[in-house]
């Protein structure tokens, strides 16, 4: 849930609510209405009017870890889009590690690091001075070769097209962005134009001053509609008030089917062993099939389960019994993960995987501050003059919230969630490798061609009530 930090006022400064509200899933296509750009996916740099108030250019390109290793760029992919995808993956692992450090090892974690990155890129449109510099550095945007901060938005548009505008319709892909702005405020036209063209975020005026409660209900209803009722009443009473200037909302919904489904007839109750040594009952799915798999460093098992269409996969990382998942999480780097994925080979497997549903909701403010994004959240230091027409310097982000949802079952959707039938047809063939996720696992959902981490999390407690 959203805390009451939204819309607070400090030292006479007005706060902007950055609200990345997420339901697990793949992003939908970027669509822009009443835009001079007919199709952002085919547009050239000169076609997209990316002219924010301030531009940041680093003195030299900053290298990310392991960048010297050669990786093949996918066909028909702009090199800068590829670098942006890598930058997002570096941010993903760094942010995840900060978040995991703040949580108990028995807590489930789930988030969309790509969505957090995109939401703050939208905020970056209006940023200047050190606020802009920190946004570039924390989100690793400054690792993209010889490009300035304004061009990042063009590359984001192209990345979104590669990720979400696909011919494959075997998964349900829904995404929506929206800016809810105070109707008494005149917003910078360039900020509005770029937000709509690049990110599909239209501005909807609301009467924060005259009717804050109705504004809250309107935003909550919009979120509920865009997430098919999965996320409701996200913004609590009193969270929106007369001092609120802007609420930025991002929603994501995903519904995908396994390429190789688990038969419900093979699902049964088994024990799941949590990090604290306690055990609990889960519905354990089972199947025997060929999957991309590898036993990597220190006997950690890595398994890739494709969704229909093969362009999106779920990667499961299971440490050996003697090693905690927390240890693997802290050692993980984007280059290590890439190396593991490159080593996966088709293997005949016996897969035991819990059926589960996890939700996670948290403020990203503390983790981002620890990573160096400090000025944006400071009433005294924040510089966001490019958001409102008069170029005001009294805006800051009071807090930033993220909510994510993941459900895994035999179909890859909600179907047959309550059916438990006795085990049938389980093989005892000793020649087959076993992947048994009856203890905490790391979960990633990625786009294969660009190796973009779309979602990331930890299943530490999938237990049945």
Swiss-Prot record:
Keywords: Blood coagulation, Disulfide bond, Glycoprotein, Hemostasis, Heparin-binding, Phosphoprotein, Protease inhibitor, Secreted, Serine protease inhibitor, Signal. GO terms for biological process: blood coagulation; regulation of blood coagulation. One of its GO terms (cellular component) is extracellular space. One of its GO terms (molecular function) is serine-type endopeptidase inhibitor activity. Glycans are attached at residues 129, 168, 188, 225. The keyword Phosphoprotein applies. Pfam families: Serpin. It comes from the Eukaryota. The record marks 426-427 as: Reactive bond. It is found in: Secreted, Extracellular space. Phosphorylated by FAM20C in the extracellular medium. Plasma. The keyword Cell inner membrane does not apply. Residues 1-32 form the signal peptide. Heparin binds at residues 82, 162, 178. The modification Phosphoserine is found at residue 69. The modification Phosphothreonine is found at residue 64. Forms protease inhibiting heterodimer with TMPRSS7. Belongs to the serpin family. This is Antithrombin-III. It comes from Bos taurus (Bovine). The lineage of its organism: Eukaryota, Metazoa, Chordata, Craniata, Vertebrata.
């Amino acid at each position: 849930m959203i805390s009451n930090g939204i819309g607070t006022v400090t030292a006479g400064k007005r706060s902007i609510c950055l609200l990345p509200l997420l339901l697990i899933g793949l992003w939908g296509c970027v669509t822009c209405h009443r835009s001079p750009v007919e199709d952002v996916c085919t547009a050239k740099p000169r076609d997209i009017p990316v002219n924010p108030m301030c531009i940041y250019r680093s003195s030299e390109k900053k290298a990310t870890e392991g960048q010297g290793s050669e990786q093949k760029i996918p066909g028909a992919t702009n090199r800068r889009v590829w670098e942006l995808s890598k930058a997002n993956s570096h941010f993903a692992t760094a942010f995840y590690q900060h978040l995991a450090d703040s949580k108990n090892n028995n807590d489930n974690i789930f988030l969309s690091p790509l969505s957090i990155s995109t939401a703050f890129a939208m905020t970056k449109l209006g940023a200047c001075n050190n606020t802009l510099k920190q946004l570039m550095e924390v989100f690793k945007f400054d690792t993209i070769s010889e490009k300035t901060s304004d061009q990042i938005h063009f590359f984001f548009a192209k990345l979104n097209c590669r990720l979400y505008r696909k011919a494959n319709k075997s998964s349900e892909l829904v995404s929506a962005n929206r800016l809810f702005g105070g109707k008494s405020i005149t917003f910078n036209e360039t900020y509005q134009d770029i937000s709509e063209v690049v990110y599909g975020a239209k501005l909807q005026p609301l009467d924060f001053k005259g009717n804050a409660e109705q504004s809250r209900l309107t935003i909550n209803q919009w979120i509920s509609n865009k997430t098919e009722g999965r996320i409701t009443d996200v913004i609590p009473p009193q969270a929106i008030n007369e001092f609120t200037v802007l609420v930025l909302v991002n929603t994501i919904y995903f519904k995908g089917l396994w390429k190789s489904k688990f038969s419900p007839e093979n699902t049964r109750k088994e024990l799941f062993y949590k990090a604290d040594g306690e055990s609990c009952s889960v519905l354990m799915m089972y199947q025997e099939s060929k999957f991309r798999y590898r036993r990597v460093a220190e006997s950690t098992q890595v398994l890739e389960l494709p969704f229909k269409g093969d362009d999106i996969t779920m990667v499961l990382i299971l440490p050996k019994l003697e090693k905690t998942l927390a240890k693997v999480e802290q050692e993980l780097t984007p280059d290590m993960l890439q190396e593991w994925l490159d080593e996966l080979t088709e293997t005949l497997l016996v897969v035991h995987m819990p059926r589960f549903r996890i939700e996670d909701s948290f403020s990203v403010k503390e983790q981002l501050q620890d990573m160096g994004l400090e000025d944006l959240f400071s009433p005294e230091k924040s510089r966001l003059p490019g958001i409102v027409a008069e170029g005001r310097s009294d805006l800051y982000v009071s807090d930033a919230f993220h909510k994510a949802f993941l459900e895994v079952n035999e179909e890859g959707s909600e179907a047959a969630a309550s059916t438990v039938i006795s085990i049938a047809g389980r093989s005892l063939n000793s020649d087959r490798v076993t992947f048994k996720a009856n203890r905490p696992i790391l979960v990633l959902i990625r786009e294969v061609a660009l190796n973009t981490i779309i979602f990331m999390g930890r299943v530490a407690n999938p237990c049945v009530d």
